[in-house]
Structure formats: structure tokens, C-alpha cells
Swiss-Prot record:
<feature type="compositionally biased region" description="Basic and acidic residues">
    <location>
        <begin position="74"/>
        <end position="90"/>
    </location>
</feature>
<feature type="compositionally biased region" description="Basic residues">
    <location>
        <begin position="106"/>
        <end position="118"/>
    </location>
</feature>
<dbReference type="GO" id="GO:0034551">
    <property type="term" value="P:mitochondrial respiratory chain complex III assembly"/>
</dbReference>
<keyword id="KW-0143">Chaperone</keyword>
<dbReference type="GO" id="GO:0005759">
    <property type="term" value="C:mitochondrial matrix"/>
</dbReference>
<feature type="region of interest" description="Disordered">
    <location>
        <begin position="70"/>
        <end position="118"/>
    </location>
</feature>
<keyword id="KW-0496">Mitochondrion</keyword>
<comment type="similarity">
    <text>Belongs to the complex I LYR family. MZM1 subfamily.</text>
</comment>
<dbReference type="InterPro" id="IPR050435">
    <property type="entry name" value="MZM1/LYRM7"/>
</dbReference>
<dbReference type="InterPro" id="IPR045298">
    <property type="entry name" value="Complex1_LYR_LYRM7"/>
</dbReference>
<protein>
    <recommendedName>
        <fullName>Mitochondrial zinc maintenance protein 1, mitochondrial</fullName>
    </recommendedName>
</protein>
<comment type="subunit">
    <text>Interacts with RIP1.</text>
</comment>
<keyword id="KW-0809">Transit peptide</keyword>
<comment type="function">
    <text>Assembly factor required for Rieske Fe-S protein RIP1 incorporation into the cytochrome b-c1 (CIII) complex. Functions as a chaperone, binding to this subunit within the mitochondrial matrix and stabilizing it prior to its translocation and insertion into the late CIII dimeric intermediate within the mitochondrial inner membrane. Modulates the mitochondrial matrix zinc pool.</text>
</comment>
<dbReference type="GO" id="GO:0044183">
    <property type="term" value="F:protein folding chaperone"/>
</dbReference>
Length: 118
């Protein structure tokens, strides 16, 4: 029971952080979170499905806290947005995108794999 309450509070805090200045989206997120927990209220706490649901909701909280950043367009004439970054926002360096791993060009027996353009 306490794990469920902890997960519920965790995801609500993450939603509050991610959607801080967007009252409509924050309200929709809170309603969706509440509905999800209400649907799971009747489950047996010892059921394996409860553990899966708790892992899922903690994952959602992590993504909301670290990956979701909202932007606001201040001037309609410009394509510039003010991003609402916070201390938990994950900043990547894109190094893995700049140098992707080499793609295999041969099949299992050393034969060239046919491509759709060949």
C-alpha cells in the first residue's frame, strides 16, 4: 500500500514539475494519473500486475521529470521558443548521434544483403 502511495506522489510531483505553467495540461495529467490509480485500486497488493504497474508509473515519473520540457512561443512572428528547463532536465551531448555504429553490409555467409533499391 505504501509503495502505491509513494508512486502516486512521485508521479504527481513529476507532473507538477513538467507542466508547471500549463494549467490545462497539468489538470489533464492529474486526472489521467488519478484514473489510472482508481482503476488499480481493486487489485490485490500481492498480485504480480501491481508490481508491473508500480514499475511503469515510476518510469513515467522518471520520464516526466527528466525528458519532458515544455516550450512557449513568445512572439508569433518568430520561430523561437522559451524552454522551461529545470534542475532535473537531462541534457544530452548528442555524441552517440554524431558517430553511429557501422551498419552491417554482408549476410550470414558473406553474401551481400539485397537492399530495396537494388
Amino acid at each position: 500500500m505504501s509503495q502505491g502511495l509513494t508512486a502516486y506522489r512521485n508521479v504527481l510531483r513529476a507532473a507538477n514539475l513538467a507542466f508547471k505553467n500549463d494549467h490545462f495540461v497539468l489538470g489533464q495529467a492529474k486526472a489521467n494519473i488519478r484514473k489510472g490509480f482508481e482503476d488499480g485500486r481493486k487489485l490485490d497488493p500481492k498480485d504480480e500486475d501491481v508490481k508491473v504497474r508500480l514499475e511503469h508509473i515510476n518510469g513515467v515519473a522518471y520520464v516526466l521529470r527528466t525528458q519532458v520540457v515544455q516550450g512557449q512561443k513568445h512572439n508569433p512572428d518568430e520561430e523561437k521558443y522559451q524552454l522551461n528547463l529545470h534542475k532535473d532536465s537531462e541534457m544530452g551531448d548528442n555524441e552517440s548521434i554524431k558517430s553511429p555504429p557501422p551498419m552491417p553490409t554482408k549476410g550470414k555467409k558473406g553474401k551481400k544483403v539485397k537492399c530495396c533499391s537494388e
